[in-house]
Amino acid sequence: NSDMVKDMELYKSSIPAKFGGRISSVLDINSREGSKEKFQGSASLGLLTSSLTLEGPLFNKKTSYIVGARTTYSDWLLNLLPEKSGYKDGNAGFYDLNASIDHRFDVNNSLTLTGYFSHDRFHFDEVERYAYQNASASLKWTHAFHPNLTGTFITGYDLYNNRTENTDNPATAYTLTFGIDQFYGKADFSWQAHDHH
């Protein structure tokens, strides 16, 4: 969801060690914090997709939240296709939800709780169906040990599920599922040798 993005950077080579020795390219996306000053939001409504983003302070100006959601409803477009296309009466769509709560204890400490969930599904006939699901949650503590030394500590959980169904022939029908789930933790330290570097 682009409304939730603060910045991003694409590494095609010379990938930093913090990404764990990836041999392919890496797209590093940083989500933004919600506004600690006022409640605000944005919404978009289109022929195929819609989105909504809300953000603002919680309880005081040290805590903020941001929530974003998107969905698509493209089935009606597939239904307009001619019968011979093979896609008429197909079904395709997705939805996702992002949420983040950030609390700044003082100038040296902040805590961020982030969650994400998405679901994609499609089929172009009644025989074969596909569905995908992603979920993640993380807790990040950022601490300034020194004006030039900052540490970031993250723990979290990731989940991915893939499901394929084929009911063309009862004798050969199948359901194939695949999933990955993992807990992780990592620490990253940033040292600025000089105020001008």
Identify the meaning behind each predicted range.
Residues 1-38, 42, 51-55, 62:
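A beta-strand signature from Gram-negative outer-membrane beta-barrel systems
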Residues 5, 36, 48, 58-61, ...:
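Outer-membrane beta-barrel channels and translocator barrels
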Residues 11, 55-57, 100-104, 140-144, ...:
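Transmembrane beta-barrel domains of outer membrane proteins
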Residues 11-13, 30, 44-48, 57, ...:
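Outer-membrane beta-barrel pore domains and translocons
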Residues 23-25, 39-41, 48-52, 95-99, ...:
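Hydrophobic, lipid-facing positions within transmembrane beta-strands of outer-membrane proteins
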Residues 35-37, 57-132, 162-163:
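Periplasmic-side early beta-strands and strand-to-turn transitions of outer-membrane beta-barrels
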Residues 41-43, 63-67, 111-113, 151-155, ...:
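Transmembrane beta-strands of outer-membrane beta-barrel proteins
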Residues 108-182:
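Flexible loop and strand-edge segments within Gram-negative outer membrane beta-barrel domains
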